[in-house]
Amino acid sequence: MAEFIRAQIFGTTFEITSRYSDLQPVGMGAFGLVCSARDQLTNQNVAVKKIMKPFSTPVLAKRTYRELKLLKHLRHENVISLSDIFISPLEDIYFVTELLGTDLHRLLTSRPLEKQFIQYFLYQIMRGLKYVHSAGVVHRDLKPSNILVNENCDLKICDFGLARIQDPQMTGYVSTRYYRAPEIMLTWQKYDVEVDIWSAGCIFAEMLEGKPLFPGKDHVNQFSIITELLGTPPDDVINTIASENTLRFVKSLPKRERQPLKNKFKNADPSAIDLLERMLVFDPKKRITATEALSHDYLAPYHDPTDEPVAEEKFDWSFNDADLPVDTWKIMMYSEILDYHNVDASAQQIEEQFNGQ
């Protein structure tokens, strides 16, 4: 049985195994608190994320289970990787991952980025997305604060499964809205991996200009700002809108022509403008893919087709439509944690573990 130690961080009890020391707060998110710590086993600095009240509701339990499954499955240089996971005696869940030091949001607010950094960061984002999309996974909430960077400019995408659009907690997130694809924002249709390409395009534009491209005050204002730059969506896209209210709103907007992006990004390379134009397209099916983007001239300095891997197998989403009670999610989560630690246990043993707590 692991020995646990307690510390108070931001008024919250952090209860971790004695393997970790020197806890320092890094940040508070919507669903968890993140601290840096020293892993005494590897002598490396790590990030420890406490998931707040993971078993308080079936929705939160399912969200936590989804994030755990994704972290276990996704293994790529440009995706955050799991190095440990445990449930504390107080029944909080802790994910331990690499510590990268900063994120793209902090970098963008501190200084303008030089061309070679923009290219290298975008290359790594698209390299990570190629892998993630090949696994049948859509991030759904890609934004600068979800893109971690270290002092060597190594980049990793994080917070997978954290923001399902159906989660009511996410609807008010201004930072999320800036990067959200039109088909999600206006609930046009079932969305797919293309939403991440739109978000990456918004991030690319922000790296080029140093400020958010579409800083909408709300969804209506957001869509209006998008059409000011990209013009009115084509009729074949408008006709896919299922919601009558949304359709009425879009048709009520004044007709606008798409503006040449070179007029807005006057200092950007023509190849950067060309790639950005291929990413910010209303019709999801006409957006460039991550694989295609990696072959684009703008990313040529870093492109290596022999070192841009895809997932060995698709992620298993079979649990995603399940409507289960908290205790069942808890047992499933405990089973996943035991599997991660290569511990064999029967379903009965797992159930007895929880009934005994």
Swiss-Prot record:
It is found in: Cytoplasm; Nucleus. The active site is at 141 (proton acceptor). The modification Phosphothreonine is found at residue 171. It comes from the Eukaryota. GO terms for molecular function: ATP binding; MAP kinase activity; protein serine kinase activity. GO terms for biological process: stress-activated MAPK cascade. This is Mitogen-activated protein kinase HOG1. It comes from Colletotrichum orbiculare (strain 104-T / ATCC 96160 / CBS 514.97 / LARS 414 / MAFF 240422) (Cucumber anthracnose fungus). GO terms for cellular component: cytoplasm; nucleus. Residues 20-299 form the Protein kinase domain. Belongs to the protein kinase superfamily. Ser/Thr protein kinase family. MAP kinase subfamily. HOG1 sub-subfamily. InterPro entries: Kinase-like_dom_sf, MAP_kinase, MAP_kinase_CS, MAPK_p38-like, MAPK_Sty1/Hog1, Prot_kinase_dom, Protein_kinase_ATP_BS, Ser/Thr_kinase_AS. It catalyses: L-seryl-[protein] + ATP = O-phospho-L-seryl-[protein] + ADP + H(+); L-threonyl-[protein] + ATP = O-phospho-L-threonyl-[protein] + ADP + H(+). Pfam families: Pkinase. PANTHER family: MITOGEN-ACTIVATED PROTEIN KINASE.
